[in-house]
Structures are given as C-alpha cells and as structure tokens.
Amino acid sequence: MNYAIVFRLLGYIQMIEGVLLLLPAVTSLIYAEWAVMGVFLLTAAISAALGLGLRTIKPRSKVFYMREGFAATALSWIAISIVGAVPFVLTGCIPNPVDALFETVSGFTTTGASILPAVEGLPNGILFWRSFTHWIGGMGVLVFLLSLLPLTGGSHVNLMKAESPGPQVDKLVPKVQSTAKILYGIYFALTVVEFCFLLAGGMNVFDSLLTSFGTAGTGGFGFKNDSFASFSPYIQWVVTIFMILFGVNFNAYFLLLLRRFRRAASSEEVRAYFGIILAAVAVITVNIRSLYGTFGEALRHAAFQVGSIITTTGFSSCDFDLWPTLAKEVLVLLMFVGACAGSTGGGIKVSRFLLLGKTLGKELKQALHPQVVAPVRMDGKLVNHETIRTTNVYIAAYIFLFGASLMLVSLDGFDMVTNFTSVAATLNNIGPGLNQVGPMMNFGAYSNFAKLVLIFDMLAGRLEIFPMLVLFLPDTWRRF
C-alpha cells in the first residue's frame, strides 16, 4: 500500500469539502442564522486544516494501483461523512454522533434515509447542507476531484473504476480527466434545467434548489415532513421526469450532444430501463386505481413512486405503504433493479440484470446443445469473460452482505418487512422502506449498532461493495 499517496489524496478531498462547507454558511448568513453560520465556518476551517496537513505528506513513489484506488475511495467517503456530520452535532439538530453520521452518510451516498421525525423546523443552513450532500455525492466526490487535478499514470482510471457505478467504466473521450469534466458538465446542466422548471411552477428559489440537488443526486432528503405530497401535480410531474432522466446512463447524453441519436437510442440498457418503468407504472396504476378519484391521479402517483424507487431517489408523493400488496411488491422489486450504470442512481443496476439474463440464456442453450458456441453480447459488442465474472462476484458479494446485514439488524426485534426493506433501502441507496421505515416514517428507532450496520450498507451500496470490503483484507494494508 502506498500510504503517502492515499493520504495526500484524502488531503485534496478534505480541502474541497472545506470549500463546499462555505455554501451552507452563506445560506445561514442570508437567513440570519448566526450560530449555524459559525458552526459551518468552524467545520470548514477544520476540514481545510486537515486537508492542508495531509497535503504536506510527500509520496516517494507515485505508483497508484487498484489497491490504492479502492482504499482511497472508501476512506474518502468515510472521511467526508465524519467531517460532514459535525454541523449536525454542533448545532444541536442531531446531538447523537451516530445519528448525525447516519444522516450525513445517507446524504453523501444519496440514500435519503433519515433518523429525523420532522425536518420543517430545521435551520435553512442545515436543510441546505442535507440536500447539498446529495448533489456532491451524486456524481461522486472522486469524479469531481478527477475533473480538477492532473493525476499521473493510471491513477485516473483506478480511481474512477473504484467509485463509478456499474459493471464497467466507459471513457467518453481518451483522457479520463476530460471524461470527468464532461460528466459534471452534463450533471450541472440537467440540475439547472430542472431548477428552472420548478421555478416556473411557482416553487420558491430555496425549495427549487433543494429539490434539484436531491433529484440530481437521486437522493431522497425532503424539506417537508410529507416529502412531495403537498406539492402541485405540475411539481410532482417535473420531479418524476427528472428523477427518471438522472437514472439514465450519462454516456447516452454525451452521444446526444454529439448528435449520435441512433447509437444513444440503441442502448439495450436504456431501452430495458424505460421498458421496466412503463411496465411497472402500468401495473401499479391499475392496482391502485380504486384508491384515487381519477385515473390521472393514480397514474401520477404510480409514475412518481416508480421513478423514485427505480432511480433510488426515495422521494414520496403519497404514503405508498398504504397501497395494495401487489403495488408494494413491485416497488420492492424495483429497489433491487436500480437505475442504469453510469447514472447517479443506485441499486444492482439494469445492465447487470441484462448480463445475468443473457448469461443464463447462454447456459441454457449450452445445456441443450453442448457443442454450440453462444457468446454474450451487449449493444452488439462481445462481453468479455472478465466482465461476466466480475458481475457474478458482485452479485455473490451483494447477497452475502444483504444476508449478514439482515441478521444483524434483526437483533433489534422489528418485524421481518421492516428489517428486510431497511437493508434493501440502505444497500440499494433508496431511502424509505416499508412498515416502521415507510415513506412517512424514519430510521430513528433502530439502535446505534443497527444504524452502524446500515451506515456500512449505504457506503457499500454507493461504492459497489468492493471498496468497503477490501478494507477488511490484510493484503490491502501491506506496504510494497
């Protein structure tokens, strides 16, 4: 392990977080929240000082392999979450450090699971920081770093592979740093467009900003106790559309910018993603029709919740825990499917399910006809065995972690549905589950131990499991 270069990278991350913490301080200044502003300024100073201290470490070697990539990724997310939790504790909004860490990790990992029973009484600076963590974490803190810093050798690729969602990383252009800039450019542009549409619908500037942060990062922190239930149908439709758009592989947007419309539309993953959404909306709309006055209202709530769950955003337009069993079962299944690879969404990812389906088809063919060569293809390209192997290992690790987490949180004594959906909601970065952790409930009743398990799940889900698991391997920490 090249400790020096990992710590130096952590220094960059903490310096960036120190700068970002100034934005909620400015928000507190605007709303004359002087004590809250002081807390954010203090936290920003601590983060910047920590970053400057780590930056003084000079690595003797600039070699940066996947081991360093995994460790730097996991440690970076842990570090920004610990520092990001400080304002919650010092302002007294969340005095319990474990609860504050849970809330912050939930923000950065774009999970949106909360321990707060009510949010409308929180200072505006804290509300801004909660939602802003979604936007920071949506595209990835290291992707942001890559867009700014000229790292050497294969460092760019190893960092992006360690943090990026999906079975493989596609470079949009030859230079990874340029790819990171393009991704953030698209991310920022879509956020601004949604912000403008929300303003046009009568939502005020502050609420529009928080909503755009949450939607862009596919996080689920609301600033109203009932999430989006009290907003107009126009606002709900705008949020629905943009949740779905942020769940699309960003490579497709890059192709659209290049006017390669046919290639963008031919993506098997994107087509499957929209197909799943349409099918789920149709099934749920029919199933919940009797609960609402008009077909249009049922369609709106079905589309909102399907978009929210499959993209792992976690916003709510109603209490879907009161829906019929079939509708809730469809939503739970969507929790596992997730959004597209290369998007800001979580879950297992549509591309992995496509690969699993194609691999299963290949195995069935060869079981019937052993001599037949049946290659697996995605978008007309041959999928190599390494990608298939990595996908299978990921699914195995996912099942193991899900089962272990379920057993551990069950020690708190809650019912099976609550525990199962709690793990599903955190490991897939969804936010709300069912029963005691439903859309109008929260995770506050869990013990500190269970919350720490769920914190690990949120980080593991956002980082595609492997970076968090390798922290437990002795080989990770051996010097070379």
Model-derived regions, located:
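Membrane-proximal intracellular helices of multi-pass ion channels
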Residues: M1-F480
